[in-house]
Amino acid sequence: MRFINHGVCGATLILAAGGAAAADSSVTLYGVVDANIQYLDNGGVHSYSEKSGGSTGSLFGLKGTEDLGGGLKAQFNVETGFNVNNGGLFADTSALFYRQAWVGLSDARYGSLTMGRQYEPSFRVVCPADPFRANEVLSPFSANVLAIDRNTLSTQYDSGRASNSIMYQSPDLKGLKLYGMYAFSATVSQPVPATTGNMLNVAATYSGYGFYAGLAYVNQHPGQETIAGLPTSLSLLGTEHFIGALAYRIGIVNLQFNYSYNRAQDPAPGSLAAHLGTGHSLSIAELGATIQATPADAITIAGVQRNVRGAHDNAPSFELGVDHSISQRTSLYMRAGYIKNNGTATVSWPGVTVTAPGTKQVLATVGMTHRF
């Protein structure tokens, strides 16, 4: 075993019995350490705290490939997240590699087939069209997707990652990529304990000439979730997701837009979901831009609108970000955001509990990111 330093890519572990095999197989250790100081006004309750993952989630992982000959490769990736402020695992503490854990085969001519816990095709569609790249802590898009809202508790959200999944990804067809995923039932603990049903997730993206476009369709089968304070488990209704994303670069400005509509099935008459009215459909729209002001400075801005159908429940939110690169691996950043809940809406930054429906949140943070 020997170490090879690849700079930004981190340290590479080459596992081989001899010199010839060393050129055919590799394992790369990589990661991100991100910490920030945050001010939050949560419905009039003010607080200061240290947080992890404000720009990019703090993480580390291992990925590797083996050349099998004839253009065929075996590959794997295992990746976990952690809180740099206390050293604990991030979010789902029951899973060691909660971010990614998959293995598969790839071929430059035919594409790749992978199995395990992996990013969904629909997430791959949205990410390039969100200025904050669907960050789990401070992206306003993620705040709206992950909102724990009474009117939509039974409407399944698009989580971004799927366990027990198998996915095909086509090769790059002159800018066009196709994705198809099927995931079997899985149990999760975040943001609430739940068992999701099987899921079909398909997508297509195109990138070229400064233009990006993506479409995705998701069909999630029914499941169950546990909500504190309810006498029994709550049904997760079968939910369809329709997602579109666009981006266009004009000089130093990259304009970005995405829209998603989550359509839930009607709850069974007499069920707890029907009695509580937790199965409303909803839409999320985001418009923003990324501005590369200088080679070292980027400005990001986004506005998001979440609307729940059939209820007085909507939440406009805005966020501004500035990132300054000190080196290829180290950067400083600032974020300032605002969420206004209207009616019964309870949208919040991930990990923050809303003090009461209809309240606002104001957030400001400064932090540092280092990649290895």
What are these regions (language model features)?
Residues 17-20:
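N-terminal signal peptide c-region/cleavage motif recognized by signal peptidases
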Residues 201-319, 335:
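Detector for outer-membrane/organellar transmembrane beta-barrel domains
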Residues 61-63, 102-105, 167-169, 203-205, ...:
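Outer-membrane beta-barrel architecture
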Residues 326, 358-372:
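Outer-membrane beta-barrel "beta-signal"
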Residues 35-41, 80-84, 119-121, 182-186, ...:
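Transmembrane beta-strands of outer-membrane beta-barrel pores
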Residues 24-40, 48-184, 196, 205-209:
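Outer membrane beta-barrel
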Residues 27-35, 70, 74-78, 113, ...:
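Transmembrane beta-strands of outer-membrane beta-barrel proteins
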